[in-house]
């Protein structure tokens, strides 16, 4: 009867709605700015500057591998090293990279680039990335990090007691300390910290220092 047909249509709509509502994150993957790569937006809720997202980048592949590597960039940086991802894939591993909140693909119009008050803020996107990679079939995850990403990743693994069961941490020129003399650390660091506390948006540069070509290429 017409009533039964209508009821079936209603049930079908409800079922489809539930499926779409609970759809896994992989359903949202889309083409990245790098050829042969895809990206996934990871909603991170809101912080002191408003809505926040992170971006997980994945090298395209025909089938998932059991081993995967996640790359975390450094300060004033983002993932663009396609050759690195290609090399990792050539060795039989899936390759992922994370653009942290307020960096690269994750910068939103209302945000100040790289703004952070506590490095632990980044733990959320690291955790979400691991979860997504696991959901795609990876049984082993290796973490590679550069510069400030090395500091963030090391702190994350220490604070979480490696609850994500990362097999290895690979550090590329990690930032663990300032490249200053002991005398400079005693004078400059307290001075900069004091200025930052009073004028948090002030840009401080060494005298006559010009932006590096590498910095300009990223910006």
Describe the residue ranges of each PLM region.
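The serine-hydrolase catalytic nucleophile loop
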Residues: 76-86
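Conserved alpha/beta-hydrolase
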Residues: 77, 89-109
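N-terminal cap/lid segment of alpha/beta-hydrolase-fold proteins
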Residues: 28-62
């Amino acid at each position: 009867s017409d009533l039964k047909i209508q009821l079936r249509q209603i049930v079908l709509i409800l079922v489809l709605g539930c499926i779409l509502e609970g759809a896994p994150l992989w359903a949202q993957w889309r083409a990245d700015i790098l050829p042969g790569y895809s990206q996934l937006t990871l909603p991170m809720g809101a912080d002191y500057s408003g809505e926040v997202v992170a971006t997980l980048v994945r090298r395209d592949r025909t089938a998932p591998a059991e081993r995967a590597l996640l790359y975390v960039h450094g300060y004033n940086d983002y993932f663009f090293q396609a050759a690195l991802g290609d090399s990792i894939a050539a060795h039989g591993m899936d390759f992922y990279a994370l653009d942290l909140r307020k960096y690269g693909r994750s910068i939103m119009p209302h945000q100040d680039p790289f703004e952070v008050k506590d490095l632990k803020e980044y733990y959320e996107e690291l955790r979400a990335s691991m979860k997504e990679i696991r959901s795609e079939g990876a049984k082993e995850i290796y973490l590679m990090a550069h510069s400030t990403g090395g500091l963030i990743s090391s702190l994350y693994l220490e604070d979480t007691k490696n609850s994500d069961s990362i097999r290895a941490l690979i550090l590329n020129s990690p930032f663990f300390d300032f490249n200053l003399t002991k005398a400079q650390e005693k004078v400059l660091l307290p001075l900069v910290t004091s200025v930052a506390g009073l004028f948090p948006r002030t840009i401080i540069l060494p005298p006559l220092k010009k932006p590096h070509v590498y910095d300009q290429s990223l910006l």
